[in-house]
Amino acid sequence: MSTKTGNYISIAIFAFFGGIARAWLNSSFGFYGTFWGNIIGCFLLAFFTYLFMEFKDVRQWLTVGLGTGFVGAFTTFSTFNLDVLKNIQANVPITALIYFLSSIIFGFCFAYLGMNAGKQVGNLLRKED
């Protein structure tokens, strides 16, 4: 099997699980499920990216599977935008603005935390080798 084919299969498998996790969040927490899914996704993508940067021999199928597959299916930019528009149309523009700004601010903060956590875990794992 070619590397390209393996990457596509990995993305599909990980996306399946990311989609299930997101569906569970949305069914369990509704509107807040989308918010927290996106925030957690910001953390996870940064975490995996910086963790894998600490190692030279990480398989590409794993990096694209977790990043593009799992996190890509777990997060949703389109639903985020739709939720903002729904709040505007429901004449609650303050709620829309708070949701929009908190998503951007918390997303950035959690990505920053994920970056630092990924670097630290990577350093710890390298020291154990």
Swiss-Prot record:
Keywords: Cell membrane, Ion channel, Ion transport, Membrane, Metal-binding, Sodium, Transmembrane, Transmembrane helix, Transport. It catalyses: fluoride(in) = fluoride(out). It comes from the Bacteria. It is a multi-pass membrane protein. The chain crosses the membrane at residues 11-31, 35-55, 62-82, 94-114. InterPro entries: FluC (IPR003691). It is found in: Cell membrane. GO terms for cellular component: plasma membrane. Na(+) is not transported, but it plays an essential structural role and its presence is essential for fluoride channel function. GO terms for molecular function: fluoride channel activity; metal ion binding. Na(+) binds at G72, T75. One of its GO terms (biological process) is cellular detoxification of fluoride. Heterodimer composed of FluC1 and FluC2. Neither FluC1 nor FluC2 alone catalyzes fluoride efflux from liposomes. Belongs to the fluoride channel Fluc/FEX (TC 1.A.43) family. Fluoride-specific ion channel. Important for reducing fluoride concentration in the cell, thus reducing its toxicity. PANTHER family: FLUORIDE EXPORT PROTEIN 1-RELATED. This is Fluoride-specific ion channel FluC 1. The gene is fluC1.
